[in-house]
Amino acid sequence: MLSNKNDPSCHFERSEKSISNKKTWDRWELIAIYFLQKKWYKIIDSNYKISGGEVDIIANFNWKTIFIEVKYRKNLSHGIPEESLSKTKKKNILKVIKYYILKNKIKEEDIRFEFIAITEVNEKAKINHFKDVEL
């Protein structure tokens, strides 16, 4: 469990057993969630799916709704994580964002898209956080 004593909204919990039973990707997504919470993001949802698309993390930060894509690479033999955000992937993410803001009556000026790239270096996570990414 990760929580911040000063902010009850900064809380995300999974048991150690559930973490160990999840696939590798979930481990890195959880690391991204912890990373965001340490920066005072309030996590709203993860793995938000509609037909034809998914957003890894949805959060609130500074009165904005933030949509976050997370990419992980164990090594760089397949390229850096930032290169994996293709036009098709961006199009699918945009479709999900449009659906979400329509469903939840959120203004376009109150949203932002971010990207978290995680690489494993000496068994530790190296995290690059890109804000205001253009879709």
What feature does the model see in each segment?
Residues M1-N4:
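An acidic/histidine-cluster motif and surrounding catalytic segment
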Residues K17-S20:
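A cross-taxon signal for low-complexity, glycine/charged-rich
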Residues L36, I57-S77, K87, I93:
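Conserved catalytic cores of phosphodiester-cleaving nucleases, focusing on short active-site segments
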Residues K38-S51:
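A short acidic/basic microdomain associated with nuclease active sites
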Residues G52, T65-F67, D110, I127:
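Structural motif
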Residues S77-I106:
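Mid-chain, well-packed structural core segment of small domains
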Residues L102-L135:
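Domain-level recognition of nuclease-like catalytic cores that cleave nucleotide substrates
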